[in-house]
C-alpha cells in the first residue's frame, strides 16, 4: 500500500504546475519537490535573477521549468502572466498560490499602505490568478489548487493584523471555492506553515524567535521541505478525496 501511495504522489507526468513566489524559500522548495513528481513547471516571481537560478536547479534534476516574471500585486501583470503560461503550456493543472509578504506593525501605527500591499499580494493576488486559470481547469475537469496560508491566519498574532487578515481570508476563499468546483474534479486546499526557517523568518529578533520555539511541541523550527512535501501531497492523486481543508505544518504550535 505504501508503495502505491508513493507512486501516486510521484506521478505527475504530463501535468503543468504553476508556482508563484518560486524564486526563494518555500516557493523554491515547492518547485524542486514538484519537479520530482514529473510535473512541468511554470515558475513565477518578480525577481527574475533568483528565478533563473531555480529554473537551472530544476533542469539540473532532469526536470522542465520555464520562468515567468509576475507581480501578484498588479492585476495586469497577473492577467498577462496567466496568458503567457497558457500560451506556453496549453493548460495549468496544479496552481500553487505561494507568493506572500509581511509588513508588520502594531494596529495603532500600521500604515494604510502596508495594509493594502499585504492584502493585495497575499489575498487579492491569489483570487485574481485563480480566477484567470479556473475556466480551463473546469473545462479539463481536473485541477489542484493549493493556497499558502499561515498559522497566523489560524491563531492571530500581535503586530500582524494585515498578514493575519490576508491569510484568514485566504483560508475562507479556499473553503468557499472548494465547494464551488468540487463537481468539476478540482480540489482546493491550503497549507498553513508555522515557524519555518526562511528568509522571511531569518530577520526575526532573537527573543521573538526563542519565544516562538518554546511554543512548538516538536521543539524545532520547520523547514521549507516540510512545507513543500505537504504541498506536493495535496497536488497529487493521493489527495484526490481531500478538498476544502487546511493542512497545518507547524510542529504542534497550533492545534485546531
Predicted regions located by residue number:
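Active-site helix of classical SDR
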Residues: 130, 166, 174
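Residue(s) in the substrate-gating loop at a strand-loop-helix junction
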Residues: 150
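Substrate-binding pocket helix/loop in short-chain dehydrogenase/reductase
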Residues: 106-107, 111-119, 212
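Short, small/polar-rich loop/turn modules that mediate ligand/substrate recognition or access, typified
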Residues: 182, 187, 242-244, 250
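The beta1-alpha1 cofactor-binding region of Rossmann-like NAD(H)/NADP(H)-dependent oxidoreductases
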Residues: 48-49, 70-81, 112, 225-226
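Canonical Rossmann dinucleotide-binding motif of NAD(H)/NADP(H)-dependent dehydrogenases/reductases
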Residues: 10-41
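Alpha-helical segment proximal to the catalytic Tyr-Lys
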Residues: 135, 179-183, 240
Amino acid at each position: 500500500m505504501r508503495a502505491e501511495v508513493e507512486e501516486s504522489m510521484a506521478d505527475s507526468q504530463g501535468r503543468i504546475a504553476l508556482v508563484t513566489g518560486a524564486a526563494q524559500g518555500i516557493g523554491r522548495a515547492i518547485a524542486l519537490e514538484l519537479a520530482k513528481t514529473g510535473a512541468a513547471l511554470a515558475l513565477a516571481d518578480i525577481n527574475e535573477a533568483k528565478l533563473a537560478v531555480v529554473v537551472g536547479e530544476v533542469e539540473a534534476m532532469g526536470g522542465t521549468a520555464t520562468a515567468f516574471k509576475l507581480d501578484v500585486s498588479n492585476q495586469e501583470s497577473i492577467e498577462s502572466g496567466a496568458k503567457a503560461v497558457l500560451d506556453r503550456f496549453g493548460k495549468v493543472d496544479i496552481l500553487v498560490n505561494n507568493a506572500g509578504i509581511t509588513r508588520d506593525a502594531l494596529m495603532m501605527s500600521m500604515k494604510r499602505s502596508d495594509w493594502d500591499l499585504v492584502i493585495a499580494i497575499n489575498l487579492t493576488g491569489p483570487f485574481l490568478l485563480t480566477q484567470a486559470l479556473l475556466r480551463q481547469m473546469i473545462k479539463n475537469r481536473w485541477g489542484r489548487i493549493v493556497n499558502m496560508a499561515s498559522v497566523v491566519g489560524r491563531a492571530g498574532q500581535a503586530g500582524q493584523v494585515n498578514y493575519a487578515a490576508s491569510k484568514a481570508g485566504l483560508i475562507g476563499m479556499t473553503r468557499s471555492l472548494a465547494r464551488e468546483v468540487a463537481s468539476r474534479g478540482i480540489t482546493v486546499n491550503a497549507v498553513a506553515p508555522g515557524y519555518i526557517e526562511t528568509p522571511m523568518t531569518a530577520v526575526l529578533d532573537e527573543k521573538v524567535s526563542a519565544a516562538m520555539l518554546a511554543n512548538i511541541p516538536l521543539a524545532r523550527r520547520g523547514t521549507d521541505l516540510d512545507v513543500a512535501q505537504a504541498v506536493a501531497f495535496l497536488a497529487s492523486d493521493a489527495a484526490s478525496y481531500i478538498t476544502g481543508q487546511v493542512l497545518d505544518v507547524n510542529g504542534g504550535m497550533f492545534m485546531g
